[in-house]
């Protein structure tokens, strides 16, 4: 079977479902398909995962970060006293807590790393990053990259790409505010439009909307927060399916269909506060699902490559059969003199 040469990755947003990416990465590590990656375009949780890949963290280190994060109250529990921050800070908490958690882990592997720009990451690790964000001041998408923003911190840009409105405070960069890129470009694949799809793995976390079931839930601040998260997810899905996906390229997308987690932001909201709820079992299931789904996907990609090469070679063979000889050698040439 022909060998894939993957140089570009695209990682969509997807909230907590991004754990599926971890299982997918484990399979890609086994297949040796991450060693040639030079460009990664991503949004939201995809941007966070892109940093794992860029900084060459092992799959065991990545899984350790995921499992430890869910038990960190500083990261996953927002007390009631923080509710005032929606007015004063425009968000219940800061996404910088998540980035600080990653930086602490990176400091073990790279003691000299405090902050890195897009240019520095490219020079040191050989990967060009592209993080999708939504500029609130201009109401438009902005992709931070080595070409457009070489001197911006990759960590700050990643924070902007992950900052869900109201849950997290907006990120200030060069005098303007940024939120999660899902509102404007949740699947930033067009930036690689000049790259052969044979060299790209594009991962999309997408789930069809569940049928609405009427309830008698009383409307209050807790209910509104839950519904905002749902609407955010609807916007994300619509933006992906309508604006970005190409039907002719569907066989080249990694798009797991049987995602069991109902909502991308699995949160519990009550009088004690807000908790990002993710169990060990859910993590285990998503990692396994990501692994098995990627295994099936890579098999399909190899078959596509094989069939493409087979067709190309058959075409070349046909051309050779049709080509005429440069000279006629069917008869013996006449001697120059009569002997």
Predicted regions span which residues?
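Patatin-like phospholipase
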Residues: 1-43, 51-327, 336-339
């Amino acid at each position: 079977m022909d060998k894939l040469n993957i140089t570009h990755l695209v990682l969509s947003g997807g909230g907590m479902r991004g754990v599926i990416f971890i299982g997918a990465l484990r399979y890609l590590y086994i297949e040796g398909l991450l060693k040639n990656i030079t460009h990664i375009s991503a949004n939201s949780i995809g941007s966070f995962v892109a940093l794992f890949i860029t900084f060459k963290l092992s799959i065991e280190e990545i899984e350790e970060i995921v499992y430890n994060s869910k038990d960190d109250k500083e990261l996953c529990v927002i007390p009631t006293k923080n509710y005032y921050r929606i007015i004063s800070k425009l968000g219940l908490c800061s996404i910088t807590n998540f980035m600080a958690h990653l930086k602490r882990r990176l400091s073990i592997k790279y003691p000299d790393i405090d902050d890195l720009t897009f240019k520095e990451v490219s020079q040191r690790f050989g990967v060009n990053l592209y993080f999708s964000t939504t500029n609130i001041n201009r109401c438009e998408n902005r992709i931070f990259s080595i070409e457009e923003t070489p001197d911006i911190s990759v960590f700050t840009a990643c924070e902007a790409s992950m900052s869900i409105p109201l849950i997290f405070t907006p990120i200030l960069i060069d005098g303007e505010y940024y939120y999660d890129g899902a509102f404007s470009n949740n699947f930033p694949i067009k930036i690689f439009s000049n790259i052969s799809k044979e060299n790209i793995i594009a991962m999309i976390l997408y789930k069809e909307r569940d049928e609405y079931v009427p309830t008698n839930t009383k409307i209050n601040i807790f209910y509104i927060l839950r519904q905002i998260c749902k609407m955010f997810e609807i916007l994300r899905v619509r933006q992906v399916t309508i604006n970005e996906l190409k039907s002719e390229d569907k066989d080249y997308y990694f798009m797991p269909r049987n995602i069991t987690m109902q909502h991308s932001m699995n949160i519990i909201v009550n009088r004690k506060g807000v908790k990002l709820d993710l169990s060990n079992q859910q993590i285990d299931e998503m990692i396994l699902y990501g692994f098995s789904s990627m295994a099936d996907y890579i098999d399909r990609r190899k078959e596509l490559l094989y069939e493409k090469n087979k067709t190309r070679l058959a075409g070349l063979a046909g051309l050779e059969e049709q080509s005429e000889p440069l000279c006629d050698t069917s008869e013996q040439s006449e001697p120059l003199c009569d002997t």
